[in-house]
């Protein structure tokens, strides 16, 4: 089926409408917080403690996630560009949604540097979900997904952090598990029966894999900042960085080991190195600020590197062939399963907390055992950590079904590409001259009068071996 992918009016109107709504809502509801307001001057503000972490998280969202998805040979523009678009819209909507739940003072949402970090966390979950549908949806569909995912993320985050009192410093549950299974549910709803017609573009080339590795390295380097960005100042934040650092390092070695072991000639697969090596940062997220101990963090990374790499080899093909889950980036192996592992590790670590390990004040401070939680024990905290993981999975699955089915994203007027034109930049981007393409035009107003054929690069005839004419 050939759908009209000309977005000349639909995309501009959608973007402008959303931004006008943001301007109005910000004008009505958003003001600076105490540290940013000129009425109360002080140079000792939260900004100077949090901004370095905010910078690192910001780079991860826009550079790390964006470039990680450039592995597709003909989808680099869209991977980086659409990630940029949905993240830019998502942070605005996240500031409002999270503000209404967490930062409302009177009738105003007060915004400071901590809001910016939390908004980036929310958008990181959106970027995770983007990986599942990469190459198969239009930018309008992505904006719609972002709007509803940010909304559901804020609700789920409020339930976990405010009602269940769950500890999730690095977002193993709220960010990675939610984003992964929301995205996987949506991509299952949007299943493409004839995606094999675009299979040749679903592969990588040398240069695209190299660009994707840049994204991996940015994510890997800055993940300690990501997991510690909103932890309490002092020992909690310090522990979160150390635990993440150790888990990431161990994950690299086991990912490389398993990748080599699974190849009959012992060669490495770049897909595994790009996507399995950062999984240790995901898995240690919930327990990052707990007394996991450095050796415990190494164990988490060790196990996660093995499971993530095995997932790319065996689980992803199984999900596509048996369950019709077309996971473009393999987010189930980088974010989904490691996120669940992180939730379980957090629950076990919390349940095993003791006075000998934490001390009385440390136990109260680390788990907020005061006020509403003053009668809680470590086992109670561990039990509620499991509840939080289950709630997150339920919210992600139900939310993905609602967005995929309830919003009828399969209808052709969203401008999505047809099955034979997935994973192709030329559908939505002006391509440089001389760049070969296998794009089949879908807009009837631009189709040639004859039958549509894939365009191919012009090849000049080879020179003759001799310029002397041949005579019989």
UniProtKB/Swiss-Prot annotation:
GO terms for molecular function: ammonium channel activity; ankyrin binding; carbon dioxide transmembrane transporter activity. Glycans are attached at residue 435. The keyword Transport applies. Keywords: Ammonia transport, Cell membrane, Glycoprotein, Membrane, Transmembrane, Transmembrane helix, Transport. The keyword Membrane applies. GO terms for biological process: ammonium homeostasis; ammonium transmembrane transport; intracellular monoatomic ion homeostasis; transepithelial ammonium transport. Residues 31-51, 98-114, 161-168, 231-241, 316-336, 410-450 are extracellular. InterPro entries: Ammonium/urea_transptr, NH4_transpt_AmtB-like_dom, RhesusRHD. It holds the Pfam family Ammonium_transp. It catalyses: NH4(+)(in) = NH4(+)(out); methylamine(out) = methylamine(in); CO2(out) = CO2(in). GO terms for cellular component: apical plasma membrane; basolateral plasma membrane; cytoplasmic vesicle; plasma membrane. Belongs to the ammonium transporter (TC 2.A.49) family. Rh subfamily. This is Ammonium transporter Rh type C. It comes from Pongo abelii (Sumatran orangutan). The gene is RHCG.
């Amino acid at each position: 089926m050939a759908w009209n992918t000309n977005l000349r009016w639909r995309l501009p109107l959608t973007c402008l409408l959303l931004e006008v709504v943001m301007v109005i809502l910000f004008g009505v509801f958003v003001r600076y917080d105490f540290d940013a307001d000129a009425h109360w001057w002080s140079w000792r503000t939260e900004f100077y403690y949090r901004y370095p972490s905010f910078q690192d998280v910001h780079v991860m969202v826009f550079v790390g996630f964006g470039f990680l998805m450039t592995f597709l040979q003909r989808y680099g523009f869209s991977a980086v560009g659409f990630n940029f678009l949905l993240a830019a819209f998502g942070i605005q909507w996240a500031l409002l949604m999270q503000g209404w739940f967490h930062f409302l003072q009177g009738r105003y949402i007060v915004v400071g540097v901590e809001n910016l970090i939390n908004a980036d966390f929310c958008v990181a979950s959106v970027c995770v979900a983007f990986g599942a549908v990469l190459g198969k949806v239009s930018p309008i569909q992505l904006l719609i997904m972002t709007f509803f995912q940010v909304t559901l993320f804020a609700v789920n985050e409020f339930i976990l952090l405010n009602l269940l009192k769950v500890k999730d410093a690095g977002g193993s549950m709220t960010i990675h598990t939610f984003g992964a299974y929301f995205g996987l549910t949506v991509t299952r709803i949007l299943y493409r029966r004839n995606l094999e017609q675009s299979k040749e573009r679903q592969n990588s080339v040398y240069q695209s894999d190299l660009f994707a590795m840049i994204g991996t390295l940015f994510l890997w380097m800055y993940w300690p900042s990501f997991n510690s960005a909103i932890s309490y100042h002092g020992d909690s934040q310090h522990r979160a960085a150390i635990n993440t650092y150790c888990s990431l390092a161990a994950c690299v070695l086991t990912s490389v080991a398993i990748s080599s072991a699974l190849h009959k000639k012992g060669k490495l697969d770049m897909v595994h190195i790009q996507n399995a090596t950062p999984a240790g940062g995901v898995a240690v997220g919930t327990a990052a600020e707990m007394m996991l101990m450095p050796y415990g963090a190494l164990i988490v990374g060790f196990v996660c590197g093995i499971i993530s790499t095995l997932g790319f080899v065996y689980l992803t093909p199984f999900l596509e062939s048996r369950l019709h889950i077309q996971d473009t980036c393999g987010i189930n192996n980088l974010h989904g399963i490691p996120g669940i592992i992180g939730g379980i590790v957090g629950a076990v670590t919390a349940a095993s907390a003791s006075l000998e390990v934490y001390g009385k004040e440390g136990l109260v401070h680390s788990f907020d055992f005061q006020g509403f939680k003053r009668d809680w024990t470590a086992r109670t905290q561990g039990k509620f950590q499991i509840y939080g993981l289950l709630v997150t999975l339920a919210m992600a699955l139900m939310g993905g079904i609602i967005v995929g089915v309830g919003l009828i994203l399969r209808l052709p007027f969203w401008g999505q590409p047809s099955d034979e034109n997935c994973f192709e930049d030329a559908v939505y981007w002006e391509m440089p001259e001389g760049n070969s393409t296998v794009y089949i035009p879908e807009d009837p107003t631009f189709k040639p009068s004859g039958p549509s054929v894939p365009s191919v690069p012009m090849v000049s005839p080879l020179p003759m071996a001799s310029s002397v004419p041949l005579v019989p």
